[in-house]
Amino acid sequence: MSFPTTPEHLEELAAAFQAKSTGEVFAGCVGATDGLHIRTAAPSIHDVLNVLRYFSGSKGCYGLNVQAIADAKFRFVCMSCCSPGSTNDWTAFMSSKMSDAVATLPHGYYILGDAAYPLSDQLLTPYPGKGLDAEYDSFNFHLSQLRVKVEQSFGILVARWGILWRPLRVGFDERPKLIRALFHLHNYCIDEGSTPIGRGEEKEKTRKRRPHTTNDILPDDFRVAKPTGARRSGEVEMRRGIMLSLQRVGQKRPRRNIERNTPR
């Protein structure tokens, strides 16, 4: 697991995402980022000064906010598991070494995030608001089609490792080590072409405990709660350039997607 720094690695990751981008307009994307809530047993006052920082009110349990960046092939290129469960994605990302690594990406390369992340030329996020003009809505839709790779990567990770289906009960200092090991093993399994055991192949007891994933999308129980209300505004050159490219080729959100998301 290594963050891309060499021209060869950057070009390899960017080519894989561009091939999956409609009209190949998302040139330069080398990853997609998001947060994963991993449940843990409550830490003790001997482990941390503020135990409640590890409690997520939205999840109703203790845990860790794990930040990660995935490539187009469901491999993780970077991860951080040092933030308490109550931490939002913005804070967890900015307090990790990942944010420094992303900030050093060469001009023209970037990762994708959702509205919880800070917009920059190296980290593109959706345009804020509802009822957007077609060109902004198109950008948001096509960004989400690529950003979903990190959610699918999390989904594969969680479905594969049964130890994540219940709160981690290893020692407090051992939890980050265990989580990192699972991420490395995930990449190894992807490289080896190993497929997680299907639900139909499992014993009934195990099948009932396994988190149910559809198209490898992460179940809600593992998602970090997202902020509600107004989103941050602003614009950066890279995002505007892609939005204009989509507009120039007449690429809009597919009608079937609009109809599926229209309230009836």
What are these regions (language model features)?
Residues 1-264:
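Short, well-ordered secondary-structure "scaffold" segments embedded in the functional core
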